[in-house]
Amino acid sequence: MSGKAGFTPEDPEDSDNRHGSPLFEGIFTALNWMTVLPVPGASVFDRTTGARVMASLPFVGFVFGMFTAIIMWAIGPISGVIHVDGLLVAVLIVAFWELLNRFMHLDGLADVSDALGSYAAPPRAREILADPRTGLFGLATAMLSVLVQVAAVASLVDSTVWWMICFIPVLGRIAGQVTALKNHHAFSPTGFGALVIGTVKFWWIALWLLVTPALAFWCAELISPLSPLTSVNTPFVAGPFPAAINPAWLGGWVAITAVVACVFAALFSRRLSRSFGGLNGDCIGACIHLGASISAVMLAVVANAMV
């Protein structure tokens, strides 16, 4: 995101005319800012652009999930010939997530951890937040968050609900939306935070909280419970879940997980706002990464319960 987003010079006469379709501008600009994908973004950067990007943020998570599903299905036939350890697959998936977003959210988490761990007054904390160097707090927090994700994904890989891995990036980004709700403000008038923080409406989050579990229910109905890594002879046999596994319950658990991640993001954002005198883009990244870690753990609980 750094270097990709910032306010464009104001031109009151044609600023609105330079905006494209809200839907497509939001989606494509979100992919342009939040990933390494060569997707064209908006031509004008203002809070309208920022709002559209934040409204589309979970869609970016679904793109991550789509690529994750492709990775899983590509590894499936290989596992029919040679053993592919679930832990190795988990490492590859989490590494792919980080590479796809240029370690952006992990960097935000590290910066926020250093600043928060300093217990400094807001002015000094903001200086630490802007420091490009990473300290012990940042390194340790980033490492632990990645390890949690790897361990949780490894549990899911060999489970009957392996497809839930694809929802982890989505749930983390819904949590990230909470950081930019209208009751929050950016501590700087410039930069990415000023573009997006305070632009998100609650009903946007509520809509994603309905759509995501519905898609999880659909996946539970249509995708085989057999893991592509453990089903050697028929790695991709489609079929219904056993009667003991209720797809509606799985969709409900995804909804509960999303709500928990959002509640965490709301509480954590309040804490960060008090510590820094406002929020910035790093705070959004930290909430996304930690929200994804929390979601991964909660989904892994389901996987372990079904082993």
Curated annotation (Swiss-Prot):
It comes from Corynebacterium glutamicum (strain R). It is an enzyme of class 2 (transferase). It is a multi-pass membrane protein. Pathway: Cofactor biosynthesis; adenosylcobalamin biosynthesis; adenosylcobalamin from cob(II)yrinate a,c-diamide: step 7/7. It catalyses: alpha-ribazole + adenosylcob(III)inamide-GDP = adenosylcob(III)alamin + GMP + H(+); alpha-ribazole 5'-phosphate + adenosylcob(III)inamide-GDP = adenosylcob(III)alamin 5'-phosphate + GMP + H(+). Signal peptide: none annotated. Its EC number is 2.7.8.26. Its cofactor is Mg(2+). One of its GO terms (molecular function) is adenosylcobinamide-GDP ribazoletransferase activity. Keywords: Cell membrane, Cobalamin biosynthesis, Magnesium, Membrane, Transferase, Transmembrane, Transmembrane helix. It is found in: Cell membrane. The keyword Hydrolase does not apply. This is Adenosylcobinamide-GDP ribazoletransferase. One of its GO terms (cellular component) is plasma membrane.
